[in-house]
Amino acid sequence: LLSWRGAQRDHQPELQLVSALSWLRGAVTALLLGGLASAQADQVNLDGSEQWLMKSAEGRDYRIMVSLPEGDVPYTGGYPVVYLLDGNAYFPAFHAAKRAQKQWRKAVIVAIGYPSSTPLDFERRAFDLSPPQLPERNDPPQGGQDLFLDFIEQRLMPRVNQRFKVDQDQVSLVGHSFGGMFGIYALFTRPQLFQHVVAISPSLWWRDRYLLEHERAFTKRAHAGELDLTHRSLSMWVGDREMPQEIQDVRLLQLRLESLSHYGLRS
């Protein structure tokens, strides 16, 4: 997923895509084997990483954990960047998996977390990653997905672009569960932000499958020629032990999106 642009230049798209998927699978496997209970939620003290503290326009605090690239800037003119949600829980596993594979050491991982002492800050992620909720059901507070996207687009991305030379054709978003749902929402509503979205066990069932409305609008815009989906991709992963309906939801979404491959979207 990180190497689609480079893959086309090398005329080896299948090989490069498999390599990219292998890197991400290695990171996910490391995460699952370690378990959330052992995930690092402390201050980042990992070799080859740094940490930033940032605020959104509304004053919400974020802890940004960055896995630094190794070596010279790639021949593409910039480093591939992966934005990783739920950074407190997942950053150490992804950072270790990246450094263990030589071909991906030039990537930058930007993990978005919170200044809390727990791997998963359920109240913050419930707000940041979700659609608006009815007032009587809005506990914990939800509905901050567009504000969170604003923070990423208007504050975090400019800082990353200032700190590193970024290959703008190699910007990815990775999220799990609610994070996967959020990643798909980002693709449907702001397809220009990320070239690649990886949604691991996405919560497609949430709010009576609220994403269907955004999917229909996205598909309509694509067929009308309003979107440039060249080199855009959506990769959805589910485990074979998940609920059958959750697996089926992912398969059906993939089938529906196949009609957009004519416009460049890979799913």
Residue map of PLM features:
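Non-catalytic cap/lid and distal C-terminal segments of serine-dependent acyl enzymes
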Residues: 42-267
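Intrinsic-disorder-associated, low-complexity terminal segments enriched in Asp/Asn/His/Tyr and depleted
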Residues: 10-11
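Bacterial N-terminal signal peptides
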Residues: 26-35
